[in-house]
């Protein structure tokens, strides 16, 4: 029990401070622990992708995660995944979704993503965000059809919001996730992250991505509105927190210099108060 308690505390501490934590904390204990585990896994592989280790070291570390996931699904999990076994069994979490997340992180490691084609960006979003959603909706208890659809739309909405929020931070890592089609639309021919983020036409390049995010938010709202409120309480809170980020980005705009945007604690509390009591 002591080891299980320590693992729970570790998963919870990983989630603290994230925009998802407000939604996680509204879940019943068993569901909450499963979501903490999923989030902790995602953070660990994301930290590998974003580290300054040589590419070959990061690729090896991601491959080790694949091996450990395979071991988990053979019911012989390594120590760091031992407490995941109950969640995998209870909620039917799929091996391919865990592996898809690792594949998404590998896309960042193989080469710095710069001005990808929209289809490539969509694949990236599916792997690093919607695959997480496909695991999460099983924990929330949505039906298969609605769960897959919600994961598709909300995962992409959240990831596109991340991309728009983190333009400058990503450029510092040598990455540029704004798709080539959007850059072409704005007349930006360069794929150099630092040149693009300084270009006066950047707001025009960001506009289609923001519109796409809003479309996915609208689609996910429609799905959640058709489901019992108690089931979609957590994803609703997550969605509202991220939609607040997108709204702040749209108000601020994307012209340089860009001040970071943050949802205030007051706004977060208002969202939690409004949606945590959904029955």
UniProtKB/Swiss-Prot annotation:
The record's CDD domains line, in alphabetical order, gives: Trans_IPPS_HH
Question: What pathway, per the record?
Answer: Secondary metabolite biosynthesis; hopanoid biosynthesis
The record's Gene3D superfamilies line, in alphabetical order, gives: Farnesyl Diphosphate Synthase
Q: Which GO biological-process labels does this protein carry?
A: carotenoid biosynthetic process
Q: Which InterPro entries match?
A: Isoprenoid_synthase_dom_sf, SQ_synth_HpnD-like, Squ/phyt_synthse, Squalene/phytoene_synthase_CS, Trans_IPPS_bact-type, Trans_IPPS_HH
Would you indicate the residue range of the signal peptide? none
Documented EC number(s): 2.5.1.103
Keyword Transferase recorded: yes
- Protein name in the entry: Presqualene diphosphate synthase
């Amino acid at each position: 029990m002591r080891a299980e308690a320590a693992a729970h505390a570790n998963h919870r501490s990983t989630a603290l401070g994230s925009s998802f934590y407000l939604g996680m904390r509204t879940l019943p204990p068993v569901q909450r622990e499963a979501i903490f585990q999923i989030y902790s896994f995602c953070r660990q592989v994301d930290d590998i992708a974003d580290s300054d280790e040589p590419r070959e070291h990061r690729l090896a570390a991601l491959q080790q995660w694949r091996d450990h996931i395979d071991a988990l699904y053979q019911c012989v999990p390594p120590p760091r995944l031992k407490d995941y076994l109950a969640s995998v069994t209870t909620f039917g979490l799929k091996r391919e979704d865990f592996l898809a997340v690792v594949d998404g992180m590998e896309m960042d490691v193989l080469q710095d993503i710069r001005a990808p084609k929209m289809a490539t960006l969509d694949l990236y979003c599916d792997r690093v965000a919607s695959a997480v959603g496909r695991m999460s909706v099983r924990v929330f208890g949505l039906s298969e059809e609605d769960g897959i659809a919600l994961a598709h739309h909300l995962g992409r909405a959240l990831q596109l919001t991340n991309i728009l929020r983190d333009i400058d931070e990503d450029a510092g890592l040598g990455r540029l996730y704004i798709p080539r089609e959007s850059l072409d639309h704005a007349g930006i021919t360069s794929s150099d992250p630092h040149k693009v983020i300084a270009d006066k036409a950047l707001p025009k390049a960001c506009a289609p991505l923001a519109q796409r995010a809003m479309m996915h938010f609208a689609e996910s709202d429609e799905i959640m509105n058709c489901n019992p409120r108690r089931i979609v309480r957590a994803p609703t809170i997550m969605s509202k927190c991220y939609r607040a980020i997108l709204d702040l980005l749209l108000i601020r705009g994307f012209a340089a210099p860009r001040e970071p945007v943050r949802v205030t604690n007051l706004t977060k509390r208002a969202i939690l108060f409004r949606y945590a009591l959904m029955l």
